[in-house]
Amino acid sequence: MSFLKKSLLLVLFLGLVSFSICEEEKRETEEEENEDDMDEESEEKKRESPDRPPGFSPFRVD
């Protein structure tokens, strides 16, 4: 009976370890995707606003 308990505990432990490794890899890929999206957004903003100070409006209001 103790052999079955040890085997069961070993299987559960190994399953838990593999599950946590998969979750960690999933988080890393999501973080990389988010960083790529942020880089793309910042590049778009750079293209939209050429060397103008913040708050500058090209329209003149009299």
Curated annotation (Swiss-Prot):
BP term (GO), one: vasodilation
Location(s) in or outside the cell: Secreted
Molecular-function GO term, any one: toxin activity
Biased composition (Acidic residues): 30-42
Gene Ontology annotations for the cellular component aspect, listed alphabetically: extracellular region
Keywords from the UniProt entry: Cleavage on pair of basic residues, G-protein coupled receptor impairing toxin, Secreted, Signal, Toxin, Vasoactive, Vasodilator
Tissue and organ expression note: Expressed by the skin glands.
Proregion positions: 23-51
Keyword hit for Mitochondrion: no
Location of region: Disordered: 24-62
Similarity comment: family membership: Belongs to the frog skin active peptide (FSAP) family. Bradykinin-related peptide subfamily.
Functional note: Induces relaxation of rat smooth muscle from tail artery and contraction of that from ileum, urinary bladder and uterus. Binds to both bradykinin receptor B1 (BDKRB1) and B2 (BDKRB2).
Name under which the protein is recorded: [Ser6, Val10, Asp11]-phyllokinin
Organism: Agalychnis spurrelli (Gliding leaf frog)
Taxonomic lineage: Eukaryota, Metazoa, Chordata, Craniata, Vertebrata
